Swiss-Prot record:
Keyword annotations from UniProtKB, A to Z: Cell inner membrane, Cell membrane, Membrane
Entry's family note: Belongs to the UPF0161 family.
Pfam families in UniProt: YidD
The protein, known as: Putative membrane protein insertion efficiency factor
Subcellular location: Cell inner membrane
Membrane topology according to the record: Peripheral membrane protein
Function (record text): Could be involved in insertion of integral membrane proteins into the membrane.
GO cellular component, one term: plasma membrane
NCBIfam families: membrane protein insertion efficiency factor YidD
HAMAP family xref list: UPF0161_YidD (MF_00386)
Length: 113
């Protein structure tokens, strides 16, 4: 998606040129990146837009993780978990309200043992 490429370009080349001034964690650009990865374009755009409007001296700041909606389906009782999954876990879904979750990114890399 083009939005993800633009955000990564901003994070890699433009963001290091200015001082860190975001009042929230994760930063506004990281928040936008997570939103565009997990939501459709319009919802991600408006969530990011309102987040940037809140990122000013008149707001307290602090932790503001993205909230996403997701339906989880029950697992078959005969399901046998595979602990050596081929796909690495990237995000945690922390329950917020009914079918709404905080999205938290895992930043540690898995080491082979």
């Amino acid at each position: 998606m083009i939005c993800l490429k633009i955000l990564r370009f901003y994070q890699k080349f433009l963001s290091p040129l200015k001082p860190a001034a975001c009042r929230y964690y994760p930063s506004c650009s990281e928040y936008a990146l997570w939103q565009f990865q997990k939501k459709n374009f319009f919802l991600a755009f408006f969530s990011t837009f309102f987040r940037i409007l809140r990122c000013n001296p008149f707001f307290k700041g602090g932790f503001d993780y993205p909230r996403v909606s997701k339906n989880f389906y029950p697992i078959n009782l005969c399901f046998k978990p595979i602990f050596l999954a081929k796909k690495q876990l990237c995000f945690l879904y922390i329950p917020y309200k009914n079918k709404s979750f905080y999205l938290i990114k895992i930043i540690f890399k898995r080491t082979n043992q």
